[in-house]
Amino acid sequence: MVRKMNKLAKRLASTSKSRQPEPESDSDGSEFDFDNAIEEKPMEAMDIEEVESDGDDDERELQAAFAAGLLKDGLNIQVAKKRPIINKSAEMKEKLAEITKDLPWVETLEVVTPHSEMDKKVENDDFQRELNFYKQAEKAVQIAYPRLLNLGIKVLRPTDYYAEMAKSDTHMQKVRKRLLGIQEMKERQEAFRRIREEKKFAVKVQKEVLAAKNTEKKNLAEAVKKHKKGMKQQLEDMLNNVKRHGLDQDDDAPTGAFGDRLGGRGGAGRGGAGRGGSMRNAGELKRKLKSDKFGYGGKKKGMKRNNKESFNDLFGAPRGGFGGRGRGGGRGGRGGRGRR
């Protein structure tokens, strides 16, 4: 039936295409291209009659099928029939009785537990359903365990039981070697990580120590600077006090060449430039003493060598003559180059 319907549809489509009118010429009056035109052969009268007769037969068949209720309104497609469910319980029980063997209970270990019904809520809950399975297995063990003990069958494993390994010793040695290698690699990585952390900690401690040292050095420099500033201020205060109050140089000044020039042991007077008198006067006195002893210019012929008289003159000279501190004298300058 379906093949006839498809065949009828193809024939109707071919006849509709053959009966289409030829296209008219363009409105602008252009000529038709006869060279490129496709020549169409007219259908013969016999072919048309065959198509019409076949179409009438197919239509009659479709009408008869529709009247018999084989066709429905709308799109008609062939629907495969479903295979009926086969449930031959009687035959299955007979076959079960044939294959059933009469074996002792030890060979089968069949245990029937009390039936426990499960509602829809428990069936849809995976956890509750698995829990019911566990309880059912537990009840089966409680039933089978005493029966096995009564039959004299050992159930529990002895303490000295040695089970043979499924894998050989060679394979287990390889596994052990592999595990030891993995453990050694982990220990090595842990050691490297610990060394890196120790290096980071050492660098951190070194930076902290260096920062503390720099801070201490800075604080010490500031303290020294403040101390120097205080000492300088204290020295300036002492000099100002000496200049302000002064000393009586005329009463304590000794007589003689050294006393007249340098102020004697009393130190510098009011017009002095430092300890022991003026730097200018000390230089002139030193130059005069050398000139008196060694002469003026020219070759001295070893006259600068020390002798008994010069030794005695050096240590016998008055101590306060070259700018030394006099009794009651104030603080003066550094003195000449010989003093230093």
Swiss-Prot record:
InterPro entries: Ebp2. The keyword Kinase does not apply. Keywords: Coiled coil, Nucleus, Ribosome biogenesis. Disulfide bonds: none annotated. Residues 206-245 form a coiled coil. It is found in: Nucleus, Nucleolus. It holds the Pfam family Ebp2. One of its GO terms (biological process) is rRNA processing. The keyword Nucleus applies. It comes from the Eukaryota. Residues 1-10 have a biased composition (Basic residues). Belongs to the EBP2 family. Required for the processing of the 27S pre-rRNA. This is Probable rRNA-processing protein EBP2 homolog. It comes from Caenorhabditis elegans. The lineage of its organism: Eukaryota, Metazoa, Ecdysozoa, Nematoda, Chromadorea.
